[in-house]
Amino acid sequence: MGSFRSSLFILVLHLLEGAQSNSLIQLNGNGYEGIVIAIDPNVPEDERLIQNIKDMVTKASPYLFEATEKRFYFKNVAILIPASWKAKPEYVKPKLETYKNADVVVTEPNPPENDGPYTEQMGNCGEKGEKIYFTPDFVAGKKVLQYGPQGRVFVHEWAHLRWGVFNEYNNEQKFYLSNKKEQPVICSAAIRGTNVLPQCQGGSCVTKPCRADRVTGLFQKECEFIPDPQQSEKASIMFAQSIDTVVEFCKEKNHNKEAPNDQNQKCNLRSTWEVIQDSEDFKKTTPMTTQPPAPTFSLLQIGQRIVCLVLDKSGSMTVGGRLKRLNQAGKLFLLQTVEQGAWVGMVAFDSAAYVKSELVQINSAAERDALARSLPTAASGGTSICSGLRSAFTVIKKKYPTDGSEIVLLTDGEDNTISACFPEVKQNGAIIHTVALGPSAAKELEELSQMTGGLQTYASDQAENNGLIDAFGALSSGNRAASQRSIQLESQGLTLQNNEWMNGTVVVDSTVGKDTLFLITLERKFLSPIPFFGVPSGRSQDSFLVGKHNKMAYFQVPGTAKVGMWKYSLQASSQTLTLTVSSRRSSATLPPVTVTSKMNKDTGKFPSPMVVYTKIHQGTLPILRAKVTALIESENGKTVTLELLDNGAGADATKNDGIYSRYFTAYDANGRYSVKVWALGGVNTPRRRAPPLWSGAMYIRGWIENGEIKWNPPRPDINKDDLQGKQVCFSRTASGGSFVASDVPKSPIPDLFPPCKITDLKAGIQGDNLINLTWTAPGDDYDHGRADRYIIRISTNILDLRDKFNDSVQVNTTDLIPKEANSEEVFVFKPEGIPFTNGTDLFIAVQAVDKTNLKSEISNIAQVSLFLPPEAPPETPPETPAPSLPCPEIQVNSTIPGIHILKIMWKWLGELQLSIA
């Protein structure tokens, strides 16, 4: 364990270039190291949970080893224990491990009894996931009947997380037609089982045979496929790892390419094993010839937060009022962002370093004010970043080890010697957050964040964008309880002329309101009167404290701010004003609405697009239909505004999961870009009753035991728009960090961006053998603008359509004019050039083309099956018995002929026709 902990920094340096990942996982030989499993602070203390986690991983490792043909196993795992749990000698202090970079989170179910394991996946096929979520009851083995053994489920979720594969089942469509037969959505197709219909009432279920609809040929929606307990087939883990004999992923030879599941839709019909083979992990390993060792574990307990500000006061900080803006942002951090109980120190540097404050524990406003008074007020000299860092290490070591401490480093200058202290940075184990101010900040600055797992941000000299305050506002601790974290409600700025006003509204919702702070920055002074704020009760609020030296005014709302709309009006002339509003959680039982944002990579090379993601949740519940806007600002000062969408199209991987996404293609220069998002929730903004388990192990509806089908209760239908009756109204802003662009050509920038891939193509039969297609329109440049035309092709062979798209039959699309990106497209056509008769399986794909003839990737492949229902049997008139013969009372059974038997036979024949159609 010791050698792993000491080598953690070296491992972090080998993260994939450009990947925006907080994870510390590394593949060392064939073993995964640096896995962090965090117990959420809301989980009640229970030491057994730690042993349960160990048992789960220990059982998962050999299963992973076998499933990957002796390539991978779990080597060591860090278990992150909440600060509120009782300390023990075996619990050590974390180094770089935090809740932010945890790979697995064990948290309470929300809502109760919703113990489904799942993995949050923002990206597309082959892209790593974000986190795995388990509940304490699941880890304890109390949900084996519902999901299977914990170790096997962990491997299923690990494949989502590490290799970006998807599920091979489909809760929304469990059967499909192929060659006139109903087929279950399974992988591999060789899995044997029974198709049955459970009819449940109360706690008991009756099993009945599935029946096909006479019009569609499909089984009832409630039908289930129950696998046989004994199978000869060994795949697939992404379908049902709960089957005892399933020990492999689906491979190309046994992959069910026709099954309508996420793996086929998102991965272009490739098997999970093919995707895994394309991963960097697979490419740099060879199978082991010996059995792997059992995993080892380190127990880490979160301690007090220790932060040292390292602030540039060199001569260049006088440019554009940078030092004044530093004071304003630093004051926000010290007065509001940093949590009560944290230890904070401060170092300023130019060509040398100066200790402005030793570590001070924040217990009251007095410590906050004293630290704020220590902020540097004069700028001169050169820039020596290493001097500032070394001084910060010394300040921290006077009271605590540097492991797990944090340094906030702000600089605006170049420093060619910054790499000289990289070895000391690795050795000291502090997490370094970097703030690059202006266009000339040291180019190596981001390396410090990347090697230590810190946040990297960039603030331009455009004061009205409020970038510096946003950067400091993003530095709330992710390791503290949710009630202590600062939440930013508003961040606005405007340059006013001729006594103009800046007016607006801030929503204080019921999940926040504690420690609410309104902060205004200015360049000179306010015109009379002082800023006006109208509180929801209708009264005005003008009790602002005005700082003369750092040009700011602020108002701390006493107690809990009143829920409602807070209106503001600020007046000035020929100067820039900014407004920042932050608050904290108001209720111990009601989770706050939180907004987090990130880019898919921290470096972008033209013409590769970037993707901006924003996650909006209340606890673990996703917030839907919010209005989310991203502002992306380059070093040139150009700002691009993007509307982010949760529509399951373009850059957005999954619809209605509370993750809003959009491609960014509007490069205008090389260098740094900052990212900021606004999120607004109004009367049409609901939340789900439960998180969508899109990438989770399959819920076991039933199983066969001693020849009899046993049933679990129906799983709550949480993937539907099952929404709370209470709407969610809120306003939030958040920093998405920064990224660095390269290879951007000089203006005019050529059009090298094709339309994005269509990922939600759906097809159905309409009327007289017509096919109805729907999809979300791509754009001219990925998901922006309007495509020029569509190419639609069809085939009766799914692989021919995928691999020989240009040779497949083309549909006439003369009358199909593309709509604006993200609009719904509908197109109806009659197949020509291919016989379309009863039982025909037809596969359809679409390709978008832009005005410069750049083509998108081929869409997901949609399928329709032409099913002509059999003619209904003619009604047989009842026989009239001869009047002279009495009609005896009879029981209907298989030995007595007559009208009853005839009706039964007709019914049976009809069912037989449907079952073999």
UniProtKB/Swiss-Prot annotation:
It is an enzyme of class 3 (hydrolase). One of its GO terms (molecular function) is metallopeptidase activity. The active site is at E157. Zn(2+) binds at H156, H160, N167. Residues 306-475 form the VWFA domain. The record marks G696, A697 as: Cleavage. Keywords: Autocatalytic cleavage, Calcium, Calcium transport, Chloride, Glycoprotein, Hydrolase, Ion transport, Metal-binding, Metalloprotease, Protease, Secreted, Signal, Transport, Zinc. It comes from the Eukaryota. Residues 1-21 form the signal peptide. GO terms for cellular component: extracellular region; plasma membrane. Its EC number is 3.4.-.-. It is found in: Secreted, Extracellular space. Glycans are attached at N503, N772, N806, N812, N838, N893. Expressed in ileum, trachea, and the major salivary glands. In ileum, expressed to the crypt and villus epithelia, whereas in trachea expressed in both surface epithelium and submucosal glands. One of its GO terms (biological process) is calcium ion transport. Residues 46-199 are annotated as: Metalloprotease domain. Glycosylated. The translation product is autoproteolytically cleaved by the metalloprotease domain in the endoplasmic reticulum into a N-terminal and a C-terminal products that remain physically associated with each other. The cleavage is necessary for calcium-activated chloride channel (CaCC) activation activity. May be involved in mediating calcium-activated chloride conductance. May play critical roles in goblet cell metaplasia, mucus hypersecretion, cystic fibrosis and AHR. May be involved in the regulation of mucus production and/or secretion by goblet cells. Involved in the regulation of tissue inflammation in the innate immune response. May play a role as a tumor suppressor. Induces MUC5AC. Induces a cAMP-dependent chloride conductance possibly through effects on CFTR in colon carcinoma cells. NCBIfam families: choice_anch_X, hCaCC. The metalloprotease region is responsible for autoproteolytic processing. It can also cross-cleave other CLCA substrates. Belongs to the CLCR family. This is Calcium-activated chloride channel regulator 1. It comes from Sus scrofa. The lineage of its organism: Eukaryota, Metazoa, Chordata, Craniata, Vertebrata. The gene is CLCA1.
